């Protein structure tokens, strides 16, 4: 048994050193190319409207606010200033979303974003995004990369298509530090020793982002309060949780397997599903020794089996916001197909680790 485990770990490490590192290098090259174009567009936006200041800065070889959705799809979060005069309200009525409400009606004129405040005192995510979309469309026509970049049509999101190969979504957002959403108040679970109190304090201090983007849990609902709502995002908190042991290596292998074998019709699976399942696996295996290099095969196998279970149940709860289903709106046939494909993949890896050379 131990020999079989060791063999699997050996082949997973080989896979990581060859396939995953090649994927990372290719994505890093793409990011540099894409960020040159996005920075140029945002510089042009800032000239037209100084309230939208580019926050796309490179630090330690990574860009703050940039998320890799897939090797050809990215999201850049554009942090806005001055959320000050608004209260953050998440009463759970909009899963995965919250609203920003004027703390005092008399402060309306003090807000940097006064024309985007609704009659009822909410800062409208939709109105800000609409204004930003107009500015980006103008900037695309003026910027020095105008021959290789165009706006993606038929969406209220701000999306750029670059060199007909890559899609980048630029999302206006507020960074919320030092507060924690009520809808995530159950976290961490009291009976689970992971993460330790110090890491919990770090994660909560890191806070979360409020994004101006279409909220999939509200698809089909048209009430104005809902279209004015902001989407909660915990990217930095999640990254912090997945430090240490073989967690990041495990996630990297899962992302590479997804890119190569689970990019399926209906797009049932993305990298965020993988990231979410790694967090759940950390809860199931709370000891640091469970994430030793020698356990890499066990952890990967556990996550793939959990993924199959989620696909068969057609439900994948968000790690911090369990009322939010990450499979919402995905076609059932696509989820079933993904379950079958994941099962084939898991069986292949477990019964014949050497097959990773071809996967």
Swiss-Prot record:
What are the UniProt keywords, alphabetically? ATP-binding, Developmental protein, Disease variant, GTP-binding, Intellectual disability, Magnesium, Metal-binding, Nucleotide-binding, Nucleotidyltransferase, Nucleus, Transferase
Q: Where expressed (tissue)?
A: Expressed in brain, cerebellum and skeletal muscle.
Its subcellular locations are: Nucleus
- Entry superkingdom: Eukaryota
Q: Does the keyword GTP-binding apply?
A: yes
| Biological process per Gene Ontology, one example term | eye development
Query: What residues does a ribonucleoside 5'-triphosphate bind to?
Result: 23-24, 63-66, 248, 252-255
According to the UniProt entry, what is the EC number of this protein? 2.7.7.-
Q: Name one GO molecular function term.
A: metal ion binding
Which residues does the annotation say bind Mg(2+)? 73, 75
GO terms under cellular component: nucleus
Q: Which SMART domains match?
A: Mab-21
Give the record's family classification: Belongs to the mab-21 family.
PANTHER family linked = CELL FATE DETERMINING PROTEIN MAB21-RELATED (PTHR10656), NUCLEOTIDYLTRANSFERASE MAB21L1-RELATED (PTHR10656:SF38)
Query: Domain comment, in the record's words?
Result: While it shares structure similarities with CGAS, it also features a number of differences. The crystal structure is in inactive conformation and the enzyme would require a conformational change to be active. The nucleotidyltransferase activity is therefore unclear.
Oligomeric state and partners?
Monomer. Homodecamer; composed of 2 back to back homopentamers. The protein may exist as monomer in solution and oiligomerizes upon ligand binding.
As for what it does, the entry says:
Putative nucleotidyltransferase required for several aspects of embryonic development including normal development of the eye. It is unclear whether it displays nucleotidyltransferase activity in vivo. Binds single-stranded RNA (ssRNA).
> Implicated in which disease?
Cerebellar, ocular, craniofacial, and genital syndrome: An autosomal recessive syndrome characterized by moderate to severe developmental delay, intellectual disability, cerebellar hypoplasia with ataxia, variable microcephaly, ophthalmological anomalies, facial dysmorphism, absent or underdeveloped nipples, underdeveloped labioscrotal folds and scrotal agenesis.
- Any idea what this protein is called? Putative nucleotidyltransferase MAB21L1
């Amino acid at each position: 048994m131990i020999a079989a485990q060791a063999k699997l770990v050996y082949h997973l490490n080989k896979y990581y050193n060859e396939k995953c590192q090649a994927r990372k290098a290719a994505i890093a090259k793409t990011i540099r190319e894409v960020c040159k174009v996005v920075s140029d567009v945002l510089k042009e936006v800032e000239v037209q409207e100084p309230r939208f200041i580019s926050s796309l800065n490179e630090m330690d070889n990574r860009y703050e606010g940039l998320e890799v959705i897939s090797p050809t799809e990215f999201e850049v979060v554009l942090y806005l200033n001055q959320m000050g005069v608004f209260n953050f309200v998440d009463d759970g009525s909009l899963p995965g979303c919250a609203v920003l409400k004027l703390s005092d009606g008399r402060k309306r004129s003090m807000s940097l974003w006064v024309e985007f405040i609704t009659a009822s005192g909410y800062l409208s995510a939709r109105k800000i995004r609409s204004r930003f979309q107009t500015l980006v469309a103008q900037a695309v026509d003026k910027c020095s990369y105008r021959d290789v970049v165009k706006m993606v049509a038929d969406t209220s999101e701000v999306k750029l298509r670059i060199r007909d190969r890559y899609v980048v979504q630029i999302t206006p957002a507020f960074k919320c530090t030092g507060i924690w959403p009520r809808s995530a108040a159950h976290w961490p679970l009291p009976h689970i020793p992971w993460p330790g109190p110090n890491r919990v304090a770090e994660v909560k201090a890191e806070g979360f982002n409020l994004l101006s983007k279409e909220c999939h849990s509200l698809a089909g609902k048209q009430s104005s309060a809902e279209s004015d709502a902001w989407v909660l995002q915990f990217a930095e908190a999640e990254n912090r949780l997945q430090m240490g042991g073989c967690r990041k290596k495990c996630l990297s292998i899962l992302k590479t397997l997804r890119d190569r074998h689970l990019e399926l019709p209906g797009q049932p699976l993305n990298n965020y599903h993988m990231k979410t399942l790694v967090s759940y696996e950390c809860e199931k295996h709370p000891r640091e020794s469970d994430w030793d290099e020698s356990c890499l095969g066990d952890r990967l196998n556990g996550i793939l089996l959990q993924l199959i279970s989620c696909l068969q149940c057609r439900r994948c709860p968000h790690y911090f916001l369990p009322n939010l289903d990450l499979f919402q709106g995905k076609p059932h046939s696509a989820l079933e197909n993904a379950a079958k494909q994941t099962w084939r993949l898991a069986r292949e890896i477990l019964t014949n680790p050497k097959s990773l050379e071809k996967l």
